[in-house]
């Protein structure tokens, strides 16, 4: 009756976050660490062509499958990377 409050639009803030692409770096070979090689945390098989998610790596196949379902990662529940930068890697040693 007289107690109705105007509803604010909470989706406006989520739309602004959704529109901005998440940028990540593409790696042809995994970085070696003290604890061994990095693998795709979803399928555990791929160790090449990895994409860095928030705190883990995903292969291109698993990333595409997750992006078809939603914008969130199934492992860490953060936004999946949508824009990938490929660094130029030398094909031969410098002379």
Curated annotation (Swiss-Prot):
Residue intervals of every RING-type zinc finger in the record: 40-76
Motif (PTAP/PSAP motif): 90-93
Keywords: Host cell membrane, Host cytoplasm, Host membrane, Host-virus interaction, Lipoprotein, Membrane, Metal-binding, Myristate, Viral budding, Viral budding via the host ESCRT complexes, Viral release from host cell, Virion, Zinc, Zinc-finger
Topology of this chain in the membrane: Lipid-anchor
One example of a Gene Ontology biological process annotation: symbiont-mediated suppression of host cytoplasmic pattern recognition receptor signaling pathway via inhibition of RIG-I activity
Subcellular location as annotated: Virion; Host cytoplasm, Host perinuclear region; Host cell membrane
InterPro entries, per database record: RING_finger_Z_arenaviridae (IPR024183), Z_RING-type_Znf_sf (IPR038485), Z_RING_Znf (IPR003224)
Post-translational modification: Myristoylation is required for the role of RING finger protein Z in assembly and budding.
Pfam families linked: zf-P11
UniProt domain comment: Late-budding domains (L domains) are short sequence motifs essential for viral particle budding. They recruit proteins of the host ESCRT machinery (Endosomal Sorting Complex Required for Transport) or ESCRT-associated proteins.
HAMAP family to which the protein is assigned, alphabetical: ARENA_Z
Sequence similarity: Belongs to the arenaviridae Z protein family.
The name this protein goes by in its record: RING finger protein Z
